[in-house]
Amino acid sequence: MSEVIERIQSAITGNRICIFMKGNRNFPMCGFSAATVQVFEELGVPYGTVDVLSDPELREEIKLYSNWPTIPQVYIDGKFIGGCDIVRELYETGELQELVKSALSQSA
């Protein structure tokens, strides 16, 4: 297993909610990343972020890992959820809140 894959898996398993994004939660570097962070800020839940702009190899590898071509990418409880549009859609229907609640209720 490559070192990049290990870092991806470590970020995903180390955070109940993990966002691979351009920039970071305090300074998103694209509108889609900013919109995704805003959803989780509105939910008021803990989440981790990984700045893909700081590591070009990781930026490309995460797309292969998830088989998803765009950034941001959201993982909840180790499962790939999707990007900005999917996260916003799930938020609007209430499904995201249920996924988050379930993931956070399992944390020790």
Specify the residue positions occupied by each region the protein language model found.
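N-terminal organelle transit peptides
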Residues: 1-4, 105-108
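TIR-domain catalytic/interaction hotspot
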Residues: 6, 59-64
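Local sequence-structure signature of Cys/Sec-based thiol-disulfide redox active-site neighborhoods
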Residues: 9-46
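Acidic beta-strand-to-loop metal/phosphate-binding motif
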Residues: 20, 73-77
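Non-catalytic, surface beta->alpha helical segment in thiol-disulfide oxidoreductase systems
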Residues: 76-106
